[in-house]
């Protein structure tokens, strides 16, 4: 089998560069910002992203989880609306709907979501 490094180079699995790139660097502190840190969390402390990741270790990975993780790594923020975390995929979908349907269409989609969410309770 072969691996593709971050710089695009294709190398064998037993290449020493593969082992060094797959191990996280020691002492690295994850980047924290206002968007991905919960209210009341210290600036260097674990935010909801790390807590959610720890809670989902046993959960099956979906394509949306993978896409969210890649978008967060690229710098798209996760923000909070009340006590709900809004993932980057959801933010991009909302922007796309806003462009395609306008404000009225976006409000209609929000109303349909709200009614369906409240009817499940």
Swiss-Prot record:
Signal peptide: none annotated. The chain crosses the membrane at residues 92-112. The keyword Transcription does not apply. The keyword Transferase does not apply. Residues 19-35 have a biased composition (Polar residues). It is found in: Membrane. Residues 12-58 are annotated as: Disordered. Coiled coil: none annotated. InterPro entries: DUF4605 (IPR027953), FAM241_domain (IPR052502). Belongs to the FAM241 family. PANTHER family: DUF4605 DOMAIN-CONTAINING PROTEIN, PROTEIN FAM241B. This is Protein FAM241B. It comes from Homo sapiens.
């Amino acid at each position: 089998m072969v691996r593709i490094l971050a710089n695009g180079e294709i190398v064998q699995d037993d290449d020493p560069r593969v082992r060094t790139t797959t191990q996280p660097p020691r002492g690295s502190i994850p980047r924290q910002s206002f968007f991905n840190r919960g209210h009341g969390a210290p600036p260097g402390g674990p935010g909801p992203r790390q807590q959610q990741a720890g809670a989902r270790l046993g959960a099956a990975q979906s394509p949306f989880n993978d896409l969210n993780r890649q978008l967060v790594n690229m710098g798209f923020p996760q923000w909070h609306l009340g006590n709900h975390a809004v993932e980057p995929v959801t933010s991009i979908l909302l922007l796309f709907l806003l462009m395609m349907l306008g404000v009225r269409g976006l409000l209609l989609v929000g109303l349909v979501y709200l009614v369906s969410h409240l009817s499940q309770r």
